[in-house]
Amino acid sequence: MATTKLGNTKSASRAINYAEKRAEEKSGLNCDVDYAKSAFKQTRALYGKEDGIQAHTVIQSFKPGEVTPEQCNQLGLELAEKIAPNHQVAVYTHTDKDHYHNHIVINSVDLETGKKYQSNKKQRDLVKKENDNICREHGLSVTERGIAKMRYTQAEKGIVFDRDEYSWKDELRDLIENAKTHTSNLETFSEHLEEKGVGVKLRGETISYKPENENKWVRGRTLGSEYEKGAIDHEHERHQKQQREPEYADEFKINWDAVEQHTEQLKQRRVERAQETKQAHSKISSRDTRESENQRERAKGNNIRIERGDEGLSR
């Protein structure tokens, strides 16, 4: 028996933070799940849809003992492909309760059209229908009450019991996200954060942060995988690649007008060569014809002389 609960949030980052923190398995649709937050944010910024609802959520729960964590996550990804094929979706599988369940976070903006996901009755009915179909295809039980609108509990919003601790960590995450977007290497990244009052400490592959109004350092790993050194390096490499691509494109930009002109010139040359070849063949044919006529005339003359010679002998 699989049930689904629908919700939405004005903070996609909070929904992902909560879901990722407890995930046993995770996967992504139209995005790298390890960088889901930044990918979601970039798409919303691209279409100017950063206000209002940032993400829609589906909690997909299964009957105890029916699925493994891996199967649970795969079923969540299948549901995402059915209900939001053109959206970026992150699927996180939790196993901390007696029943395994997925937290499916859907970015609000359609990658192709830029339109926002509509969580109306028609869409909710679609979620229930597709979820039931997937369960039947995999031989899982189906409940008659497969869907219910839900509101996030405090924990599901990603707000931990110590609200103050969550507030400063969430603010720190936002500052780090901003620094990643506006810098191209670790040096400028650190300088950007220090200007915002956040200390940065690197030790090998470990990075830690300390806001000026806090008395303790927090590791990037504690904040989430997107705040670790490797993730930041990856983001900077992506920025550098994007900056190089226009230069590369300009360097090797094709002048299609010149190509078309050159193609026409080649066609004209082929026509001229064909005409020259035809004329040459015509000349050869005319020459051969004249030679044949001359040979026939000479042969005819020889025959006349031979006949006259024979007449003289007979006399």
Swiss-Prot record:
Key words, A-Z: Plasmid
Pfam families for this protein: Relaxase (PF03432)
Region called Disordered, residue ranges: 263-315
Domain of life per record: Bacteria
InterPro entries for the chain: Endonuclease_MobA/VirD2 (IPR005094)
Role noted for this protein: This protein is probably required for relaxation complex formation and plasmid mobilization by conjugative plasmids.
Protein name: Protein rlx
Species assigned in the record: Staphylococcus aureus
